[in-house]
């Protein structure tokens, strides 16, 4: 199996003579050893093998890792199949009749065989005879015992899809790591339509992986479909063979067994179903890939199909906003919607993609806000400086300027009055001045009215009369006093008293007259003031 032919025993068996490998050489090895069955690490069974070689169908009895096999085969050009032990299994094939292979084009050869196979290192794999080129039927009966890793009994179909019926009765013992016996009753397809079906297994020491396959149509060489269903037995580490479940997958149930048996009869129908199923299965990964690509494109901001895109607006001048046009990577419909939804004619839409674009937009806004805050801080500092300067310097200067303005106004008024007087000297009066002068003349005439003068004269006359009366009274008093003095000489004191009283009376009269004189002078002053006012009004007009 690994590059040499001959009968070799592994793990303690002594091999008989071995020869080198050749394409046409017959190798005959005869070993006689105690027979061993079942689970063995080198046990061998007596084999007597005769291998005849043909052109392309030479049969060789080859034992690997200590197993001996005996096969008696003969065959045609393409129809022989060597019986090979797998990895240390020893097998003995006893044929009731001569076991012959098929012919060139698959003539039917009845090969009733009964084989008893002992377990090898990795389990026995007794191989039945295969069909011919265009399909032969073969019947095999085998009984196998479990190997180290379990036994496996199987059969293959013919080249173009012949029917092979296998009535297999297996008595299998579990291997060290879990035997994998298979009870198979199936009609297998041909070269382009074969489909392995159905096994029932028992658990091993470390947990055997069990598979029960029930399939409907036979698969081809390039598109076999296998649907493993798990039925695990208890072990130390069971391995479960499962099928990935998708939205389009359909679970295989046990109810499909009858449909399977019915469909196995019609080979062309199986082939068409297999082709359709292959096409469907080949479309599934493509659909998954398309969905994954769609999901990736919808989240990738570098593609135009991404869903993470939106429009933001920048403020510009209205004249500049008219000049902006649609960028090449933006869709026309989205651009039209963004232009319709813009808040004012002074804004333009800008498209951003993904979270990175949004982050950049946020960073730009934060930078602009920071710059605006810096500018506002500068403005605030300048305003505080101006306010301090105004309070300390400008306000005091304003007060000084106001006081200077008051002084200047006074000086201007003085100059104005002086200029007015200078202008009025030797100059003709104006219309306003003539009016004022006429008003003053009227007032002056009123003051010089004879009625007014008569009143003043009357007052003066009354004053004169009063003065005369006062003189008369005083003279009368003096005369009376003289009379009293004559009458009462002796009364000096009395005379003195009367003199004092007369003096007091005179003084009172003088005071009264002086008061009246004061009143007259006051009236004269009032008249003079009124005359001056009238003159001023006349000068102004």
Swiss-Prot record:
This is Nucleoporin NUP57. Residues 19-36, 58-72, 105-116, 125-146, 153-172, 228-257 have a biased composition (Polar residues). Component of the nuclear pore complex (NPC). NPC constitutes the exclusive means of nucleocytoplasmic transport. NPCs allow the passive diffusion of ions and small molecules and the active, nuclear transport receptor-mediated bidirectional transport of macromolecules such as proteins, RNAs, ribonucleoparticles (RNPs), and ribosomal subunits across the nuclear envelope. Due to its 8-fold rotational symmetry, all subunits are present with 8 copies or multiples thereof. NUP57 is part of the NUP57 subcomplex (NIC96, NSP1, NUP49, NUP57) interacting with NUP49 and NSP1. Its main location: nucleus. Residues 398-425 form a coiled coil. It comes from the Eukaryota. Contains FG repeats. FG repeats are interaction sites for karyopherins (importins, exportins) and form probably an affinity gradient, guiding the transport proteins unidirectionally with their cargo through the NPC. FG repeat regions are highly flexible and lack ordered secondary structure. The overall conservation of FG repeats regarding exact sequence, spacing, and repeat unit length is limited.
